[in-house]
Amino acid sequence: YNIVDQIFIGQGVGYLGNAATNVAYPFSTICLAIALLVGIGSASRVSLCLGRKEPKAAAKAAGNGIVLMGIFGIIYLLVGETFLPLLLKAFGATTDVFPYAKQYARITLIGMPFLIVTNGMSNLIRADGKPKYSMVCMVVGAIINTILDPIFIFVCDWGIAGGGLATVIGQIFSFILALRYLWRFQTIHFEKESFLFDIKESLKICSMGISSSSNQIAVTVIQIIQYNSLTYYGALTKY
């Protein structure tokens, strides 16, 4: 999503638009860290339970994982929208870039819960033996974003807001495809009880996904340091 947005926003808005999407990008990488935490954690739990011939426990692990994705997604959206100005400045937004970054991030944050569920579900779908369907979920959203970006940015003349809106719509389509798979699982058979929140199961899920999530968080920290370094040292030269 970010690469496509960079291309079209750069053409339609200019260098400030490109800078804004870069400054807002840590929101996406943090989002992916959350998705990895729950997605890989729940997929690992499902695989272990199925290996022990415990289908109900596997369904419970998957169900709790999906519930956690939704909870974390909503919390992340609320926190991001509430502290957006402070976070953008922490990410390295300058005075010139800030209005563009705020406009773009305000819209793309709406899609973060959908992105968390989609990326988290893709791990469960792969664990169910359907990697192609998982790939389709991701590719469809990217294609829709690529189609809508030039329409919203150039035809509708919505600028950077159009790029953000195209991203969110693409993420919603991916989310719908991922959610449809709930009724297509082959190794897991869900019941209502599968989606009852269980704190112990949730902790087990997070403990198994924390390693991959930590790696993604480290990438995010490096990005933020780089952006702030560019903001500071870039201002010291006329080039």
Description of each model-found segment:
Residues 1-19, 88-95, 151-158, 220-239:
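Helix-terminus/linker motif at the lipid-water interface of multi-pass membrane proteins
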Residues 1-5, 107, 118, 141, ...:
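Transmembrane helical elements of multi-pass membrane transporters/channels
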Residues 7, 11, 44, 85-86, ...:
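Transmembrane alpha-helix boundary and packing residues in multipass membrane permease domains
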Residues 18-77, 115-134, 227, 239:
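Small-residue-rich hydrophobic transmembrane alpha-helices
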Residues 30-33, 145-150, 175-179:
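Hydrophobic transmembrane alpha-helices of multi-pass small-molecule transporters
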Residues 46-111, 155-210:
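Short alpha-helical transmembrane segments in multi-pass integral membrane proteins
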Residues 56, 69, 124-150, 161, ...:
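Alpha-helical transmembrane segments of multi-pass membrane transporters/permeases
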Residues 93-98, 105-108, 112-139:
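Cytoplasmic helix-loop-helix junction between adjacent transmembrane helices
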